From Swiss-Prot:
GO cellular component terms, semicolon-separated: cytosol
tr-type G domain ranges (all copies): 460-629
Identification of the protein by name: Translation initiation factor IF-2
Region of interest (G2), residue spans: 494-498
Cross-referenced HAMAP family: IF_2_B
Region (G1): 469-476
Compositionally biased tracts (Low complexity): 76-100, 277-287, 328-346
Region spans: G4: 569-572
Lineage summary: Bacteria, Bacillati, Bacillota, Bacilli, Lactobacillales
Region (Disordered): 33-373
Bias (Basic residues): 347-357
Length: 959
C-alpha cells in the first residue's frame, strides 16, 4: 500500500499540519512531525475524523456567526464620531465568547487555500453560466423561420426539454425578452430555416421556461455558503489564536522567571559587596524589569491596530476577500513582532540613554594584552609588514611608523628586503636570523646530511659487492656459480649487457652482488657500480692477464675508495700463470698481502667451483673490517641500478636500498620522476612488501623511466613527492635548454665549419637504460673525419610508430638493441622507407654505424696519368673539326680518359675525347709506340708538337 505524509493530508483537507499531527496522535498513530508517513487507511481515517468534526462545529457555530453578523451590521450603521458605541457593541459579543471559552476569541488569520479554492469554484460556475447564455443566444437565432404548426411536436419532446432546462435555470430574466424579439423576427422570415428538429427542441425549451420554472436565488445561496465557510474559518482562527496566546504566555512567563532569577543573583552579589543599608534597594527594579517587557509592547501594538483613521478606514472600500487577506497579513506580522518584542525594546533602549529601571553596571573597557617581544626572529626575504607584525605580536601601524622614522615608506602589505628587516629588529632589540630555505627537490641532501640517520638505530648491514673485470674473464660465470644457476649461457656473445643485482646468503649472512659489463662501451655502468659498492671483486683471467678494461675497473674502484679483492680466474686452463697476473697488477698499484700490500688475492675457477667458499669468506672478512652500518628506521634512500620500460608494467626500476626501509605504497622520487611504489619484487622474482638496506629490488609505479645511476628518496606524502619530482623535471628541462648553443660572432666561424661536417642521425631503442647510455656513448666516440653521429632520440622499450615517424622526419636510422619493433611500426617503416637495424651485441652496432659514417662522406678522387702522346700532324675537316694525328710515347690513351693539351709546358685545354681511331677503326685504347687519330670535344686549336696527356680520376678508399 502507498503511504502519505501528514503535510500532504493537511494540504488535501485544508487543515494545518499541526492539527493533523495532533489528530493523528489522538487516534493512536505513531507519528512525530508533519513529515511522518502513514498508510492509506490511516490517512482516510484522519481525513474522516476531520470531516466529522467539521459538521459538528459548523452546526454549533452557526448561531455564533449570526450573532457576529448582527453585531457587525449594527456597528456599520453607527456613525464614525461614535467610537464608544461600537466598542460597547463589541464588548457584549466578546463577553459571550469569553463565557463559553477561557481565552478571548481574536480571529486574525484565515485559511487562504480554502478561500482560493472557493473563489476558483465560483469563477468556474460563472464561466459556465456565461457559456450557457451564449448558447441560448445562438439557439435563439436558429429559431428564425419557425411556423406555428410545429407546436404539436413539442409535447413529444417535453421530457427532453425538461432535462435541458435544468442546465439553463440560472439565466437572467432579461434573456426572455430578447428571446421574444427573436421569435417575432423568426415569424417574419419563415423561409430561412434549417435543422428543423433542433428548432423544435429549442422552441419546446423556451415554452417550458415561459411557463414559469422555479428560479433559484444564487446570491442567497452563495451568501449561505460563505457564511458556513466564515464560520469554519473563525473556528480555525480561534483555535490557532488560543494556541499562540497560550504559547506566548508560557514563553513570557519563563522569560520573566529567568530574568527575575538573574536579577536576584545580581542582587545577592551586590549585597556581599555593598553596605548593609543598600542591600534592599535593588528590589524595586526587579518588579519593573519583570513587567516591562510584557506590558509595554503589547499595549502599544493594540493601540496602533485599533486606531480608526488608519488601516480600518483604508480597507473600508475593499472587498471582503481582500480585506481579510490584509488583516491576516497584519496578524502574521503582529505575531512575529510580539515574539521579537524584547529585541525591539533592547534596540530602543540602545538608541537612547540607559533605562531608568536597569541597574546593570557598564562593561569595563578591556585592556589590550601586553605580549613580550621574542628574543629571536627568523625571517625570510620578502616578508610583508603585516607578517612581521603578526610574528612579533605588534600592530602593523606601529611597524609602519617605525619604518617611517627610519626613512622607509611602506604599507602593511609591502614586502621588505633582508637588510630592512634586520634594522627593524635591531630597533626592537630582537636578534634577527635569516631563515635557511630547504630545497625539497634536492635529493642529494639526504645522502650528505649527518643528522638524517639516528645513531641509536644503527645496525649492521649486508655488504654490496661489485664484480668487475675485462670482457669474457668470467664475471657472470662466477656470479652464476654463486647463485647456482646458468644465466651466463644466455648472454649474447658472452657479454653482460646490463647490471644484474643478486643477493646470496653465506654462513648466515647476506651478500649483495652487482654484475657489471666488461665491454669498453659500458664504462659509465662500471663507474656507477663502483659508486654504490662496498667491496670490489676484480676478476682477472690467469691466461690473459691484465687487459684495458681491467685497468679501467681498477681506476673506478680507486676513485670510489672501496677495497679490492682480486680473483684470479681460469686457473684450470693449461696456459694459466697466476704469478704473471700478480706482477702485472702490482705495476698498477694492486699489491697482494703476501707482497706486503692491502689487497686480498684468491685463485679460483668459477667454471669448476674451485675456491669459491674461500672467496666468500674473504668478502665477509673485509666487510667486517669495514664496519658497514645502516639505519633501517628512516625513510629509504638509495641508487637506481637499472631501469627499463615494460609493455605491461610500465616503467620498471631496479633499486639498491642504501639507508632506511622501502615499503610498498611509499611515495618516492627517483631522479626526475616520481610516483608511488605499486609493486616490489626481489632478485628471485618474488613479491615483497619491504626492502631493508643493501637489498636490490625492482619497483613499478613511476610516471616515467628514470636514468640509471639516479638517486631516489622516499617522501612523507605523495603531494610532497609530486612537487619535488615536477620541480626536478622542470630544472632538468631548463638545463637542457641552456645547453643549446646560439650563433654569435665568437662562434660564427666554428658554426660555419660545423655545417660542412656531415651527420648520421640515429634513434637508439634498447631494453634497459644502461644499454641506451652505453650505445649513445660508444657511437659518439666513433672518430671519422668529416662525419659525426647525432643521437636524435634514445629511450627504453620496443620500437613504436612514433619512433618511425621521428626517423622519417629527421632522416635517421633506428637502432634496436635487444628490442623488436611492433607490427604497426614495422608496417609503417616499410611504407615510409625507414631503415631499422636490430642487434644484440654492442660492438657489431659500433662497426655498422662506423661503416655508415664512412659511406656518408663525399668520395675522394686521385688523378692517375695513363699515358702521353705527341701530335705529329693535323687535319682540318669541314663540318667536323680538327683531327690530330699522334703517336703514343708513354703508357696508353683510352677512349674514356680525360686529356690535357700541353703546349710549351702550359696546359691550354682540359677536356674529354670526342673520338679515338686507329686508321679508320674506332678503338677503345691505343698502346705505347702506336699511332692514331683523335678529336677533342670543344677544342679545335690543335697544333703540331702539342703534348696530349691522358688521365683518369680514381676514388680513394677510406680506412
Amino acid at each position: 500500500m502507498s503511504k502519505k505524509r501528514l503535510h500532504e493530508i493537511a494540504k488535501e483537507i485544508g487543515k494545518s499540519s499541526k492539527e493533523v499531527v495532533e489528530r493523528a496522535k489522538s487516534l493512536g498513530l505513531d507519528v512525530k512531525s508533519h513529515a511522518s508517513s502513514v498508510e492509506e487507511a490511516d490517512a482516510n481515517k484522519i481525513a474522516s475524523s476531520f470531516s466529522a468534526g467539521v459538521t459538528k462545529n459548523v452546526q454549533a457555530g452557526s448561531a455564533k456567526d449570526k450573532q457576529v453578523a448582527e453585531q457587525k451590521a449594527k456597528a456599520a450603521k453607527a456613525t464614525t464620531p461614535q467610537p464608544a458605541a461600537s466598542k460597547a457593541a463589541e464588548k457584549p459579543a466578546a463577553a459571550t465568547q469569553e463565557a463559553s471559552q477561557p481565552v478571548a476569541v481574536k480571529p486574525k488569520s484565515r485559511n487562504f487555500k480554502a478561500e482560493r479554492e472557493a473563489r476558483a469554484k465560483e469563477q468556474v460556475a460563472r464561466r459556465q453560466a456565461g457559456q450557457n447564455r451564449s448558447n441560448d443566444r445562438k439557439s435563439d437565432y436558429r429559431q428564425l423561420g419557425r411556423s406555428q404548426g410545429q407546436q404539436t411536436e413539442r409535447a413529444g419532446h417535453k421530457s427532453q426539454n425538461q432535462q435541458r432546462d435544468r442546465r439553463f435555470d440560472n439565466r437572467p430574466s432579461s434573456g426572455n425578452n430578447r428571446n421574444d424579439g427573436h421569435r417575432q423576427a423568426g415569424n417574419r422570415d419563415k423561409n430561412r430555416s434549417f435543422n428543423a428538429n433542433s428548432r423544435q427542441q429549442d422552441i419546446g425549451r423556451q415554452g417550458q421556461t415561459q411557463a414559469g420554472a422555479p428560479k433559484i436565488d444564487f446570491k442567497a445561496r452563495a451568501a449561505a455558503l460563505k457564511a458556513e465557510q466564515n464560520a469554519e474559518y473563525a473556528r480555525q482562527r480561534e483555535s490557532r489564536f488560543r494556541e499562540q496566546e497560550e504559547a506566548k504566555r508560557l514563553e513570557q512567563q519563563a522569560r520573566q522567571e529567568a530574568k527575575a532569577a538573574a536579577l536576584k543573583a545580581q542582587t545577592e552579589d551586590k549585597k556581599h559587596r555593598e553596605a548593609p543599608a543598600k542591600a534592599t534597594e535593588p528590589a524595586e527594579p526587579v518588579a519593573s524589569m519583570a513587567a516591562a517587557p510584557v506590558a509595554k509592547p503589547v499595549d502599544k501594538r493594540r493601540k496602533k491596530q485599533n486606531r480608526p483613521d488608519k488601516a480600518h478606514d483604508r480597507d473600508h472600500g475593499l472587498e471582503d476577500g481582500q480585506k481579510k487577506n490584509k488583516k491576516s497579513w497584519n496578524s502574521q506580522n503582529q505575531v512575529r513582532n510580539q515574539k521579537n518584542s524584547n529585541w525591539n525594546n533592547n534596540k530602543k533602549n540602545k538608541k537612547g540613554k540607559h533605562h531608568k529601571n536597569s541597574n546593570t553596571a557598564p562593561k569595563p573597557v578591556t585592556e589590550r594584552k601586553f605580549h613580550e617581544l621574542p628574543k629571536e626572529f627568523e625571517y625570510s626575504e620578502g616578508m610583508t609588514v603585516a607578517e612581521i607584525a603578526k610574528r612579533i605580536k605588534r600592530e602593523p601601524a606601529e611597524i609602519v611608523k617605525k619604518l617611517f622614522m627610519m626613512g622607509v615608506m611602506a604599507t602593511q602589505n609591502q614586502s621588505l628586503d633582508g637588510d630592512t628587516i634586520e634594522l627593524l629588529m635591531v630597533d626592537y632589540g630582537i636578534e634577527a636570523k635569516a631563515k635557511v630555505e630547504v630545497d625539497e627537490a634536492d635529493i642529494e641532501r639526504f645522502f650528505t646530511d649527518d643528522n638524517y640517520l639516528n645513531p641509536d638505530n644503527i645496525v649492521e648491514r649486508a655488504p654490496v659487492v661489485t664484480i668487475m673485470g675485462h670482457v669474457d674473464h668470467g664475471k657472470t660465470t662466477l656470479l652464476d656459480t654463486l647463485r647456482n644457476s646458468r644465466v651466463a649461457t644466455g648472454e649474447a656473445g658472452g657479454i653482460t649487457q646490463h647490471i644484474g643485482a643478486y643477493q646470496i646468503e653465506e654462513a648466515g649472512k647476506k651478500i649483495t652482488f652487482l654484475d657489471t659489463p666488461g665491454h669498453a662501451a659500458f664504462t659509465s655502468m662500471r663507474a656507477r657500480g663502483a659508486s654504490v659498492t662496498d667491496i670490489t671483486i676484480l676478476i682477472v683471467a690467469a691466461d690473459d692477464g691484465v687487459m684495458p678494461q681491467t685497468i679501467e675497473a681498477i681506476n673506478h674502484s680507486k676513485a670510489a675508495g672501496v677495497p679490492i679483492i682480486v680473483a684470479i680466474n681460469k686457473i684450470d686452463k693449461p696456459g694459466a700463470n697466476p704469478e704473471r697476473v700478480i706482477s702485472e697488477l702490482a705495476e698498477h698499484g694492486i699489491i697482494s698481502t703476501t707482497w706486503g700490500g692491502e689487497c686480498e688475492f684468491v685463485e679460483i675457477s668459477a667454471k669448476f667451483n674451485k675456491n669459491i667458499d674461500e672467496l666468500l669468506e674473504t668478502v665477509l672478512l673485509v666487510a667486517e673490517v669495514e664496519e658497514l652500518k645502516a639505519d633501517p628506521t628512516v625513510r629509504a634512500i638509495g641508487t637506481v641500478i637499472e631501469a627499463r620500460l615494460d609493455k605491461g608494467k610500465g616503467a620498471v626500476a631496479t633499486l639498491l636500498v642504501q639507508q632506511g626501509t622501502l615499503h610498498v605504497q611509499d611515495p618516492i622520487v627517483v631522479g626526475n620522476t616520481f610516483g608511488r611504489v605499486r609493486a616490489m619484487t626481489n632478485d628471485l622474482g618474488r613479491r615483497v612488501k619491504s626492502a631493508e638496506p643493501s637489498t636490490p629490488v625492482s619497483i613499478t609505479g613511476l610516471n616515467e623511466t628514470p636514468m640509471a645511476g639516479d638517486h631516489f628518496a622516499v617522501y612523507a606524502d605523495e603531494k610532497a613527492a609530486r612537487a619535488a619530482g615536477e620541480e626536478r623535471a622542470k630544472r632538468a628541462l631548463l638545463k637542457q635548454r641552456q645547453n643549446t648553443q646560439r650563433v654569435s660572432l665568437d662562434n660564427l666561424f666554428d658554426t660555419l665549419k660545423a655545417g660542412e661536417i656531415k651527420t648520421v642521425n640515429v634513434i637508439i631503442k634498447a631494453d634497459v637504460q644502461g644499454s641506451v647510455e652505453a650505445l649513445a656513448a660508444s657511437l659518439l666516440k666513433i672518430d671519422v673525419e668529416g662525419v659525426r653521429v647525432n643521437v636524435v632520440h634514445s629511450a627504453v622499450g620496443a620500437i613504436n610508430e612514433s619512433d618511425v615517424t621521428l626517423a622519417e622526419a629527421s632522416n635517421a636510422v633506428i637502432i634496436g638493441f635487444n628490442v623488436r619493433p611492433t607490427p604497426q611500426a614495422r608496417q609503417q617503416a616499410d611504407a615510409d622507407d625507414v631503415e631499422i637495424r636490430l642487434h644484440s651485441i654492442i660492438y657489431k652496432v659500433i662497426e655498422e654505424v662506423e661503416e655508415a659514417m664512412k659511406g656518408k662522406l663525399d668520395p675522394e678522387y686521385q688523378e692517375k696519368v695513363l699515358g702521353e702522346a705527341i701530335i705529329r700532324e693535323t687535319f682540318k675537316v669541314s663540318k667536323v673539326g680538327t683531327i690530330g694525328g699522334f703517336m703514343v710515347v708513354n703508357g696508353k690513351v683510352t677512349r674514356d680518359s680525360s686529356v690535357r693539351v700541353i703546349r710549351d709546358s702550359v696546359v691550354i685545354f682540359d677536356g674529354k675525347l670526342a673520338s679515338l681511331k686507329h686508321y679508320k677503326d674506332d678503338v677503345k685504347e691505343i698502346g705505347n709506340a702506336q699511332e692514331g687519330g683523335l678529336m677533342i670535344e670543344g677544342f679545335n686549336d690543335i697544333k703540331v708538337d702539342d703534348t696530349i696527356e691522358a688521365y683518369v680520376m680514381e676514388e680513394i678508399i677510406r680506412k
